[in-house]
């Protein structure tokens, strides 16, 4: 299965609590932090919810 490299590109300041929790669940903390996750429907759903905050690349 493919892997996704997810980078937090925008700050969480002023964002609603559900978006903050979603970013935290993805394992992202500070701006420009990067995580590599397996590509599955659950991760894709979380990325969709915060797509305006993150950058995603297939690895």
From Swiss-Prot:
Record has Ribonucleoprotein as a keyword: yes
Database matches in InterPro entries: Ribo_uL30_ferredoxin-like_sf, Ribosomal_uL30_bac-type, Ribosomal_uL30_CS, Ribosomal_uL30_ferredoxin-like
Subunit field text: Part of the 50S ribosomal subunit.
Keywords: Ribonucleoprotein, Ribosomal protein
NCBIfam families from the UniProt entry: rpmD_bact
One Pfam match: Ribosomal_L30
GO molecular function per UniProt: structural constituent of ribosome
Tree of life domain: Bacteria
One cellular component (GO) term of this entry: cytosolic large ribosomal subunit
A biological-process GO annotation: translation
Name of this chain's protein: Large ribosomal subunit protein uL30
Family: Belongs to the universal ribosomal protein uL30 family.
């Amino acid at each position: 299965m493919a892997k996704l490299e997810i980078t937090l590109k925008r700050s969480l300041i002023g964002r609603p609590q559900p978006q903050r929790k979603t970013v935290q669940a993805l394992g992202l903390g500070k701006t420009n932090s990067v995580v590599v996750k397996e590509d599955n429907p659950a991760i894709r759903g979380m990325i969709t919810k915060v797509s305006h905050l993150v950058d995603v690349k297939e690895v």
